[in-house]
């Protein structure tokens, strides 16, 4: 059992686990996550991922939901256990040892330490008192006994690794909590439409109304930014906010992102008809961003034409059944004859693509990052220990340091010079 615990808490095992988790995260970034199973089968049917895995194998290995897969969560749990065992077996004893006063009573013991010096003096007890005063003035903690003393400084540096491990564990717990208990919803909303979010009991939790949606474009017509004007209603309280790409809205644990855009409907007139608002649908086989509809031009449904559009500014292309381009229409432009019927497009209605995420683990993740940063800062503090023994006209001093021993070896002679000066003046 002890050998198993020692193996689990080994630093090399933790490094391998971190590498595997990083590799899995890279795979989760490269492969789209959370899509319908059929889309993976179709996407990797002719071109396997990395030339190795087809769609069925991607699904079997749970690569379509890496971050919630059993094997990924097992890696996180294993790493968390390794950190806990490492803290228990190594870091906590190191902190206790740094806080424990060790009493060296023989100068020969000090000579075996990493740094050792001797200061000749006429009165060793007086020199010891001067050394004690110098250390106290520079923030050292002291314990004095008869003809000897022990001092330490920077014990907080031993707390740093424990805090780093604690922060990592909190971060992983927050990430797992978010994956298992969080929710994600993607919806396209046309202006004037409402999305109701329900609680687990089926009650309305919050109602989101899209009041307006705007696409900012450059002079060449390329989209630069998407903006949605949202109105939220919750228990009689209302909130109006604008969201855009990289500027989400956070409200009571729910984050609303401006994620995408689409075209929802086209408003047109055919002959003397009233304005007709007809829904558009995507045609990915014609292009990445192509929307359209099939419209009959005769009362019996015959002689249809196909209307296609790529953005809300137009133009609207009208094709015959054989694929011939008949004409172009522009929103707000004049009517154009299409197979004997005057047709006019009033407007094209864009839709806002909203991504709603509820991640209860986010506060825990932020707390974990904060604890890690504090621990990382404390870990930079060197833990130093000094012992001094007054004996027969000599002040024997020895010390230990867990990092930057070179700087400590330069500091000790400086402390002794200050001690000698204080001793002479005293």
Swiss-Prot record:
HAMAP family the record matches: CytC_Ccs1 (MF_01392)
InterPro entries: Cyt_c_bgen_Ccs1/CcsB/ResB, ResB-like_domain
GO annotation (BP), single: cytochrome complex assembly
Protein name, entry field: Cytochrome c biogenesis protein CcsB
Presence of the UniProt keyword Transmembrane in the record: yes
Compartments (UniProt record): Cellular thylakoid membrane
Membrane topology: Multi-pass membrane protein
Entry's family note: Belongs to the Ccs1/CcsB family.
Source species, domain of life: Bacteria
Spans traversing the lipid bilayer: 11-31, 69-89, 159-179
PANTHER family in UniProt: CYTOCHROME C BIOGENESIS PROTEIN CCS1, CHLOROPLASTIC
Subunit architecture: May interact with CcsA.
Naturally occurring in which organism (per UniProt): Synechococcus sp. (strain CC9902)
Gene Ontology terms: cellular component: plasma membrane-derived thylakoid membrane
Keyword tags: Cytochrome c-type biogenesis, Membrane, Thylakoid, Transmembrane, Transmembrane helix
Function: Required during biogenesis of c-type cytochromes (cytochrome c6 and cytochrome f) at the step of heme attachment.
């Amino acid at each position: 059992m002890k050998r198993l615990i020692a193996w689990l808490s080994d630093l090399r095992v933790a490094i391998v686990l971190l590498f595997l988790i990083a590799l899995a995260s890279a795979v989760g970034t490269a492969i789209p996550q959370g899509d319908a199973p059929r889309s993976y089968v179709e996407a990797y049917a002719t071109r396997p991922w990395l030339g190795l895995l087809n769609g069925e194998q991607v699904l079997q290995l749970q690569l379509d939901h890496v971050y919630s897969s059993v094997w990924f969560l097992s890696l996180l749990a294993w790493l968390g256990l390794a950190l806990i065992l490492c803290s228990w077996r190594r870091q906590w004893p190191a902190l206790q040892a740094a806080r424990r006063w060790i009493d060296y009573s023989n100068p020969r013991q000090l000579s075996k330490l990493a740094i050792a010096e001797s200061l000749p003096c006429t009165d060793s007890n007086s020199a010891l008192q001067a050394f004690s005063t110098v250390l106290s003035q520079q923030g050292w903690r002291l314990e004095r006994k008869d003809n000897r003393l022990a001092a330490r400084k920077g014990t907080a540096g031993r707390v740093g690794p424990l805090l780093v491990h604690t922060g990592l564990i909190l971060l992983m717990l927050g990430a797992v909590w978010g994956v298992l208990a969080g929710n994600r919803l993607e919806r396209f909303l046309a202006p004037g439409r409402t999305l109701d979010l329900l609680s687990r009991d089926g009650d309305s939790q919050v109602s989101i109304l899209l009041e307006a949606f705007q696409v900012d474009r450059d002079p060449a017509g390329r989209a630069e930014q998407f903006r949605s004007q949202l109105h939220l209603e919750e228990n009689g309280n209302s909130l109006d906010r604008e969201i855009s790409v990289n500027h989400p809205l956070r409200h009571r644990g729910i984050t609303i992102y401006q994620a995408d855009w689409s075209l929802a409907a086209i408003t047109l007139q055919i002959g003397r008809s009233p304005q007709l608002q007809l829904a558009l649908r995507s045609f990915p086989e014609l292009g990445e961003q192509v929307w359209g509809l099939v419209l009959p031009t005769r009362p019996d449904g015959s002689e249809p034409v196909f209307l296609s559009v790529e953005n809300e500014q137009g133009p609207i292309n009208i094709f015959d059944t054989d694929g011939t381009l008949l004409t172009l229409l522009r929103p707000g432009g004049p009517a154009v004859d299409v197979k004997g019927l005057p047709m006019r497009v009033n407007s094209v209605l864009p839709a806002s693509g909203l991504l709603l995420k509820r991640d209860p683990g986010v506060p825990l993740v932020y707390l974990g990052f904060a604890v890690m940063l504090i621990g990382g800062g404390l870990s930079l503090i060197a833990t130093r220990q000094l012992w001094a023994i007054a004996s027969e006209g000599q002040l024997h001093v020895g010390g230990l340091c867990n990092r930057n021993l070179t700087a400590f070896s330069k500091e000790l002679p400086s402390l002794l010079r200050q001690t000698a000066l204080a001793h002479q003046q005293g």
